[in-house]
A protein has these predicted regions:
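Sec-dependent signal peptide recognition
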Residues: 2-7
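Short, linear, compositionally biased motifs with a strong N-terminal bias
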Residues: 10-11
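C-terminal motif of bacterial Sec signal peptides marking the signal peptidase cleavage site
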Residues: 14-15
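Intrinsically disordered, low-complexity proline-rich regions
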Residues: 20-24
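Primary mode marks residue(s) on the alpha4-beta5-alpha5 output face of response regulator receiver
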Residues: 25-378
Length: 378
């Protein structure tokens, strides 16, 4: 299977010309009826490893390199299970067994290097979505997929939904943690040519055994029946800008009437939640209309060092130890993507205004590490 997968990845890099006679269906709605060996099921299972706005128009290929569905957006979906299905006659049991993945062009350059056991040759960083998780790996040992028996205690991670950053230069990830039990982005295969960043999303620990100990997790996403000016509601609204495994134990801060920062809840995990809407609530008496209006963000310590540098007009790398991360799962109220500080749509350049939904922000210590990334948010 490994040889087949390597051949397939090489074919992707030079272009495949074998296409299954199946028209593209621009939908990622419910699981199709029928056998899991069918083209229809595979297209659904593989493509939905990415968010719907990528899944709907990505190319989908099978394990042998056959193109099941031609895409238009530069992303490619495939099964990442090098062992193949446990039941070949009936296909993969589910999307998790398939280890479905959706990657951009640079991620396949990374994968080719990994499969060849050579240093990946890349033009820029690559990204891979795996919203159905994987089958497990030793976090510190490349080529350990499925080898739990020979993995030291505490090193095995079977991931749920996540996004991966495959760096052109692994040294750009120096300073990131290797601890996968905190919910923070963490480094896998540290110290090798295949070091990459794992970015957990909601449900990340659904397959992990034993589960990490995360206090207060059960009720972290339940909106309280309380005034939107209350500490109780603000704690919920601000903290849930991050996945539950971070939201449950982050510090939550607010501003008092005099503009002084106050702590609504002390946290334990190094993340801090706050409202980031500089305009304030449209209705000050009743507070934020909803969590979206508050524009809450949950950031790690390095992201706040970036924010401090931004407002001070200094370079972030003078105050940051590594890249920072900030979750905004309730989105924001909009800004100009090309001009810092433009928060009114009427002042924005035409075509540059973006009001974001749920997202995660990477705040780089060195902006040059993002060279080559697109500015196209459409």
């Amino acid at each position: 299977m490994k040889k087949i997968l390597l051949t397939f990845i090489s074919a992707l890099l030079i272009g495949c010309n074998t296409t299954a006679p199946k028209p593209k269906t621009n939908t990622v709605d419910g699981e199709p009826e029928g056998p899991h060996t069918s083209v229809e099921w595979k297209i659904w299972a593989y493509s939905t490893a990415a968010p719907s706005f990528i899944a709907a128009n990505c190319t989908v290929v099978d394990n042998d390199g056959t193109v099941l569905s031609e895409g238009t957006n530069g992303w490619t979906a495939m099964s990442g299970n090098m062992a193949g299905p446990a039941d070949p006659e009936n296909g993969y049991r589910d999307r998790h067994e398939a280890i479905s993945m959706v990657g951009d062009a640079e991620s396949f350059n990374w994968m080719k290097g990994y499969m060849d056991k050579t240093k990946p040759e890349m033009n820029g960083d690559g990204w891979i979505w795996m919203l159905h998780g994987d089958s497990g790996v030793d976090n510190f040992r490349p080529y350990s997929e499925g080898d739990k028996a020979n993995t030291p205690e505490g090193a095995w991670i079977e991931s749920g939904p996540h996004l991966m950053l495959m760096p052109k230069d692994p040294s750009t990830l120096d300073g990131q943690t290797t601890d996968f039990n905190t919910g923070s982005p963490y480094l896998m295969f540290e110290g090798t040519d295949y070091a990459h960043l794992m970015i957990p999303t909601e449900g990340y620990y659904d397959y992990q055994d034993p589960l990490p100990s995360i206090p207060n997790l059960e009720n972290s996403n339940v909106e309280p029946e309380a005034p939107h000016t209350s500490a109780e509601w603000k704690i919920w609204a601000y903290s849930t800008a991050a996945p539950s495994f971070i939201a449950a134990n982050c510090t939550v801060v607010d501003m008092d009437a005099d503009g002084n920062q106050i702590v609504l809840r002390e946290g334990t995990n190094g993340w801090t939640a706050m409202a980031a809407n500089p305009r304030g609530p449209a209705d000050p008496e009743n507070g934020w209309k909803d969590a979206h209006e508050a524009m809450p963000m949950v950031g790690d310590a390095q992201s706040f060092a970036w924010v401090s540098a931004y407002f001070a007009g200094t370079k972030p790398k003078t105050t940051m130890e590594s890249d920072g991360w900030a979750w905004m799962l309730h989105g924001d109220m909009g800004e100009d993507n090309t001009k810092a500080g433009v928060l009114n749509k009427e002042d924005s350049v035409e075509g540059a205004w973006i009001e974001s939904g749920p997202h995660l922000m990477m705040m780089p210590k060195d902006q040059s590490t993002l060279d080559g990334q697109t500015t196209d948010f459409i």
